[in-house]
């Protein structure tokens, strides 16, 4: 089955710049661990695009990471690495 689109401007374009967010428990050091985890998948980490915010209670932290992926496979590997982390509760 061949899947094509009538508008190639829709959807992800590769290579491209993307951002993933992950939320987990604050005391686990996810602010530094998750960017290292993404870099290990082979994507180009955009250091200036790494940010985090603690929840109002301080129990959780949300980490946003910008990166460049050369292919959908690279993007999927980066997203899977975040999902597989035992302290990550959700990704976006």
UniProtKB/Swiss-Prot annotation:
Source domain of life: Bacteria
SUPFAM superfamilies named among the record's database cross-references: YbeD/HP0495-like
A Pfam family matched in the record: DUF493
InterPro entries membership: UPF0250_YbeD-like, YbeD-like_sf
Family designation: Belongs to the UPF0250 family.
Matches recorded under NCBIfam families: PRK00907.1
Protein name according to UniProt: UPF0250 protein XAC0666
Native source species: Xanthomonas axonopodis pv. citri (strain 306)
């Amino acid at each position: 089955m061949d899947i094509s689109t009538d508008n190639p401007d829709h959807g992800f374009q590769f290579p491209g710049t993307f951002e993933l967010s992950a939320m987990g428990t604050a005391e686990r050091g996810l602010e530094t661990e998750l960017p290292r985890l993404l870099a290990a998948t082979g994507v180009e980490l955009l250091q200036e695009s790494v940010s985090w915010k603690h929840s109002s209670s301080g129990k959780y932290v949300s980490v946003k990471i910008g990166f460049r992926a050369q292919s959908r496979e690279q993007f999927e590997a980066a997203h899977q690495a975040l999902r597989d982390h035992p302290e990550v509760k959700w990704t976006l």
